[in-house]
Amino acid sequence: RLASRYTKALARSMAQTKQTKAVTPLVNGFTTFQSGDSTVLFSRSHPTIAGNVANTLATQADLNETSLEQSLIDIAEMTDERGLLIAAKGLKLVIPSALQFTAERLMASQGRTATADNDINAIRSMGMVPQGYRVNNFLTDPDQFFIITDVPNGMKYFDRSPIKTAMEGDFDTGNVRYKARERYVFGVSDYRGIYGSNGA
């Protein structure tokens, strides 16, 4: 019974570590985590031979109707290496738990939020974020939000060595040692696959 408890605790620890590592490109994407072009993951100046491409707001903003609409406009204006429009679209909003109520109002309300105007909710009626939103409890900044786009080969996860566990007993002391090992890496191939805001 004790062995089972320790094994479960080790498995939980490994899972917790993997989830924390998985959000590192997002959490640090505005400061230290770089994409393949040597700029930070979320930048207004990803260099191409035809000019710069942006995957973040010009002025960082909290999640609201204006910032979400501008993000979707910016995504639609993304270009390839030659400066040609690629007709990119947003697919899914990824948010910390602190923004789930804001996201629900923005995505599910029939009318516009935080206004007395009798306008429709264009984001909802136009299906601008078809896969809705997803709460990631491991995001550490309560203001950051991200949009997964339909550009292929964006964020990547490589499983280099699946998890392996082992245990052994010590004859002299009667102690039992447990260990677990796995190798993986999280990163990005094409920065156009994700769009982000660091919050105001």
What residue spans do the PLM features occupy?
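Exposed beta-sheet edge/beta-hairpin loop segments within beta-rich domains
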Residues: 1, 85-86
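Long, contiguous amphipathic alpha-helices that act as assembly "spine/axial" helices in icosahedral shell
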Residues: 1-33, 93, 178-180
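Beta-rich nucleic-acid/ligand-interaction surfaces
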Residues: 27-34, 132-133, 138
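Charge-rich, acidic-biased intrinsically disordered regions
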Residues: 28-47
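Sequence/fold signature of self-assembling virion shell proteins
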Residues: 42-80, 87-92, 98-200
